[in-house]
Amino acid sequence: MNFEQARSNMVLNQLRANRIRDIDLIEKIEDFPREDLFPKDLKHLSYSDQIITLEQGRFILPPLTSSHLVQCLDLKSDDKVLEVGSGIGTITSIIIQYTTSIDCIESSEALIETFKKSLSENLFQANLLKTSIESFF
């Protein structure tokens, strides 16, 4: 599969066609190989416009949904971000390009391992905490 072409098609047909107007955001997404975050058996879905189901009822949001979320955040370089339910890091990989501080909370040990691997391979640094939401109550 040609992931560069898939990424380009996703930007053109999903993001630009659906009110993602932040040029900086579009460029960041165009330059980042989202497929690198995905397990091998799911890489072919990395640019699809569907929710991808993972273990324990967890899921990966489509690129358009993630992009709308980040666009609405209007992040600045000195913002501090807390991401709960980081999954494999698809949203983290966008946010970390805007800010120097992101703390991530994830309850799935398997997703943490996938996330750590993709963070190190893509030269990201984030604080990652394994916990369950119940531990806060």
Predicted regions and their residues:
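Cytosolic histidine kinase catalytic core of two-component systems
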Residues: 23-24, 64, 110
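Conserved nucleotide-cofactor-binding alpha/beta core module
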Residues: 74-137
